[in-house]
Each structure stands twice: as C-alpha cells, then as structure tokens.
Amino acid sequence: MEWETLLWGFFGVVMAVVVLGGIGAVGYMRKENGRYTAEARRWAVLGQSGQPVEAVVRNVRMHPNNMTRGGSRGQTVCALVLDVAYTDATGTARTASIPTFVEDALVPQFLAPGRIVHLRYDPSDPASVSIDRTRTPLELPRAD
C-alpha cells in the first residue's frame, strides 16, 4: 500500500509543476503580447491627432523567442523592436524603441540599413510614438 501512496504523491507533485508551469507560460505570453500590441493601441490615437515625422531605422531586433501570432487577416506577424531616430517639430533629435508586430513577408524590408519609416508622435509627449500604418504598412493589403 505504501508504494501506491508514494506513486500518487509523485504524480500529484508532477501534475502541480506542469499546471503551475503552464499558468506561468500563459502569463508570460500575455505580458509579452501586450507589450507588442501597445504600439497598435497608440496608433489608434496618434493616427488621428499625432504629428507626422520620418524616422531612420537604426536597428531591428527580433523577439528573443521568435514570437509570432496571427495577423488581422490570418497571416503570420512577427514581433520586432524597431530602434529609430527622428527629429521632432522643435528640432530636437530623439530616439525610440518601438515594439510592434510586422507581417513576416515585410520583415526583410525593415532589415535594410537606414530604412525610412513614417511615425506619428504626440506633440505634448514626443516620446510617445507609433508607426504611421498609412505610410509605412506593417501588413500587406489583401484583395477582397
């Protein structure tokens, strides 16, 4: 009888570790996804009221775990961080790191050295930037 108790105890510990690990993984994925989708939420606001500006991509970083997800039309989008340099309306040189999702087919275009991207920034908070999706698409247009 005692070996059965030990076996059930071992099984319980293993299952607890699996469940807790799964909960931790889901929490991590939600946090990371939120970090990259925050830029899209800023675009919803800055697309209407933000100041347009051109920026130069200085560096592109892929997510360390190559995070991808489904895009707005079912395509695959990849998590990237674009390190950009731009000059605001007052003439102040600024830099920003913009975590966002880019369709996998467009990723090579962002890897080109010195690529120009179009941004919108908040004039009252120039550090709050978003990619101007009307001028620098992050997803390919689909035929309807």
How should these model regions be labeled?
Residues 2-144:
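Oxidizing extracytosolic/periplasmic lumen-facing domains
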